[in-house]
Amino acid sequence: MTAASCPPVSTLTPARVVARVFLPFAAGYFLSYLYRTINAVLSPYLVAELGLNAADLGLLTSVYFISFGAFQLPLGLLLDRFGPRRVEASLLLLAAVGAVLFARSHSAGELILGRALIGLGVSGCLMASFKAFVVWFPTARLPAVNGWVLASGGLGALAATAPVEWALRMTDWRGLFSLLAVLSFLAALALLLAVPERRGEVAAEDLRRQWQGLMAIFRSPLFWRTAPGSVLSQASFLSIQGLWAGPWLRDVAGLDRVAAADGLFWVAAAMVGGFLGMGQLAYRL
């Protein structure tokens, strides 16, 4: 069933909104965070097979964030222009292509290109979710709903720890990324087929007005009060969680691969608890 054949919005109960709006977008952000943090567990396998060094691993991990971050400004314009469903579904198809390329890579350069495509492909997962939730959920519930979608990303981070280490006993990292490519394609398909259209998702403004609105954000004192703290905290945490915590636990703390993955699991679990707790706290206060 396509979005055009979906039942009228008025017939969607809250449970159906959760099933047909929240869950498809949450699945996308789950994959986004799984891709983001998987290198902490995957790195020794890449080193063993392809001979990557620490600089290669650092670049391989960071290129996800470079392509992800570089696309945020055009992403906002695209979300306003075409709506979150179309934009995120299209981008997730790029993530699927990137995962296929990563799975077939035989050099650091090929891995970097694949991961750059993955970063670009999942760059809209969180912002598209926020955009969709604004028009589908009551304003009073948005902090809690946003907390839940952030928690779905945390579940992706959980999946990138001990579950990935377990999966690597069943297959190799190439097979794992082939599976992730299929999951990315299915997530894109779910967005296209399950999520209905709703008035308010697409802006009627032309590109010039959209750009003026974007520039107004950069002139806001509130933006400049909050941005530095967000940048510093996210940069440090994501570099540790997304890569360097794994090698440190294995090479410095002396843990084996399974124990290191278990340690990363509890880091991600604490993050999920924080997402859920802060969302509920914001709703109640």
Named regions from a protein language model:
Residues 6-14, 196-227:
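Juxtamembrane intracellular "pre-TM" segments in multi-pass secondary transporters
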Residues 39-40, 222-268, 272-275:
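Extracytoplasmic gate region of multi-pass secondary transporters
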Residues 37, 65-73, 157-158, 268-276:
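Residue-level signature of mid-helix packing/kink "hotspots" within the transmembrane helices
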Residues 114-152:
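Cytoplasmic helix-loop-helix junction between adjacent transmembrane helices
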Residues 149-195:
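Helix-loop-helix hairpin linking two adjacent transmembrane segments in secondary transporters
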Residues 20-54, 240-246:
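Extracytoplasmic
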Residues 70-108:
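Conserved MFS/SLC helix-loop-helix module at the cytosolic interface between two early adjacent transmembrane helices
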Residues 109-115, 225-226:
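Short hydrophobic/alpha-helical segments at membrane-entry points of transmembrane helices
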